[in-house]
Each structure stands twice: as structure tokens, then as C-alpha cells.
């Protein structure tokens, strides 16, 4: 039952776009000459996909009992994404312009999303859209450059645990591959996290430059220390770093170096224009 759920959702999404006049194969809208002029009418929203999903399930002739199980499982899960803060972000006719956002200083705060899985979902959706926008801009301008800072990255790029769903493993693997891919499009991804041991191994491997501040937990010191060629003695020294000190390593270096920032950053300074 679980195995067929993604295919039902995929069919519902495709049908929802077809209902709005889209030819999926040609990427053209049959109802409007220029659908981008009126996007609110030419693209389905989350609640419309849910209604289509009900029709898709009913069309499969699963039998009453199995149909009710599918509806109860899928609809209840997805309907939650149309409520509250998630609903305002996902179940909407208009969206923020990601391409315009690339040329501005933008902070996206997800504090109002209390559930960890919801934060993971939104981070994944945003990162995916940013990556596509970066690719598009780089095609027009090969000198295009952009920086994205991903804070608390373990929410999205956590190390898969034994017994976890295969979908999460695939998601982590996909975004790990994305990290390695976007560099050639002028994108710089900065991943900040206080618990490196929670990050997927692909993330630690695919980052070019690593800056390590004081770490106390042994598993964290070994997780990051192994990726920057630290000896056991050097890993133990990570507990002794002072404020403003860090261990820095970049690809191609023979060994990591210890650095100290002369002047601490003043976080009370005026905002940057």
C-alpha cells in the first residue's frame, strides 16, 4: 500500500495541471497564449490537487475497504499542509519571485513552523527552487554568482538512521548530490551546524572549505576531524579553542590550519543596506 502512494500523488499532480490546460509533454498551456501573465488561473493549488487525488483513488477500483484506507492515509496527511502557516505558504495562488530574490539580501525565517518535518519540507522546497533559479540565471550570464547560507542544516541533511523511511534516505541523497552540482552554476552553499555528527556523510564530503569552531562532543569531533585530516590529538584540541579561534581546511591543502579572528564581529551593529 505504501509503495503505490507516490504514484497516486504523481498522477493527481499531473491531472491537476492538465485540468488547467497544460500539455505536460510540450510544456505548453492550451487555454492561454501566455499563462505567465495570469499565473493564479493557470496553475493548480494544493487543495485542488487534493480534490483530484480523491478522484484518482476512486478511479482505481481498489474496493471500498482499500479505497477508504488510501483516502484516510493520503488525504489526512496532505490536507494538513493546507492549514495554518503551512497553508499560507503552500496552498496559495501566488508565490514569491525566486529569481528576483537571488539579487537581494534575503532572510527566510521558519520559526513559526513548530514541527521538525515541516521545517525540513520547507527547506527542501526552497533549496530546490533556488537551485533551479540559479541554473536558469547562469545560462543567461556565466559570470552569475550567488551565496546561500543554510543554518541548522541537519534538519534537512541529517544522517539517515537505521529503520528510517526510504523516502527520507532518497531525499538526503538527492540534496547531497545537489550540493556537488550547483557549484558549476556559480552558487556557493554555506552549511552551518552545531552538530556535525548529525549531518549526512555526503554533505561533509562535498563541501570544499570547512571552518571548525570549538566542539566538545567526541562524536562531533571525530565526524568533522576525519574529513579535514586531523590526528586524534588534534581532534581532542578542538575542545580547547577559544572565542574567535577556528580550524580551517580547504580542498588541496596539505593540512588544516588554526586561525584567530583579530576583531570579533559586532552583532549589534546597524543592519547592512
Model-derived features with residue positions:
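P-loop NTPase motor domains
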Residues: 1-180, 184-187, 242, 246-252
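Flexible loop/turn segments at secondary-structure boundaries
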Residues: 52, 114-117, 155-158, 197-200, ...
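Conserved ATP-driven motor cores of ASCE-family P-loop NTPases powering translocation/secretion/packaging/pilus
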Residues: 170-264
Amino acid at each position: 500500500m505504501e509503495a503505490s502512494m507516490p504514484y497516486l500523488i504523481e498522477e493527481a499532480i499531473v491531472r491537476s495541471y492538465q485540468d488547467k490546460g497544460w500539455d505536460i509533454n510540450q510544456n505548453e498551456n492550451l487555454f492561454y497564449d501566455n499563462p505567465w501573465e495570469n499565473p493564479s488561473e493557470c496553475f493548480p493549488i494544493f487543495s485542488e490537487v487534493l480534490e483530484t487525488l480523491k478522484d484518482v483513488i476512486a478511479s482505481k477500483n481498489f474496493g471500498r475497504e482499500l479505497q477508504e484506507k488510501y483516502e484516510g492515509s493520503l488525504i489526512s496527511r496532505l490536507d494538513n499542509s493546507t492549514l495554518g502557516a503551512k497553508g499560507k505558504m503552500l496552498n496559495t495562488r501566488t508565490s514569491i519571485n525566486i529569481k528576483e530574490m537571488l539579487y537581494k539580501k534575503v532572510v527566510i525565517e521558519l520559526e513559526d513552523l513548530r514541527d521538525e518535518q515541516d521545517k525540513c519540507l520547507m527547506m527542501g522546497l526552497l533549496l530546490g527552487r533556488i537551485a533551479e533559479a540559479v541554473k536558469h540565471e547562469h545560462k543567461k550570464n556565466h559570470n552569475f554568482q550567488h551565496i546561500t547560507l543554510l543554518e541548522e542544516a541537519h534538519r534537512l541533511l541529517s544522517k539517515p538512521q537505521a529503520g528510517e523511511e526510504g523516502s527520507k534516505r532518497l531525499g538526503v541523497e538527492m540534496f547531497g548530490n545537489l550540493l556537488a552540482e550547483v557549484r558549476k552554476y556559480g552558487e556557493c552553499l554555506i552549511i552551518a551546524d552545531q552538530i556535525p555528527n548529525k549531518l549526512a556523510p555526503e554533505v561533509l564530503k562535498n563541501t570544499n572549505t570547512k571552518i571548525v569552531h570549538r566542539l566538545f562532543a567526541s562524536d562531533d569531533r571525530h565526524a568533522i576531524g576525519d574529513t579535514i585530516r586531523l590526528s586524534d590529538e588534534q581532534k581532542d584540541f578542538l575542545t580547547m579553542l577559544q572565542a574567535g579561534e577556528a580550524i580551517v581546511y580547504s580542498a588541496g591543502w596539505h593540512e588544516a590550519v588554526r586561525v584567530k579572528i583579530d576583531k570579533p564581529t559586532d552583532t549589534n551593529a546597524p543592519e547592512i543596506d
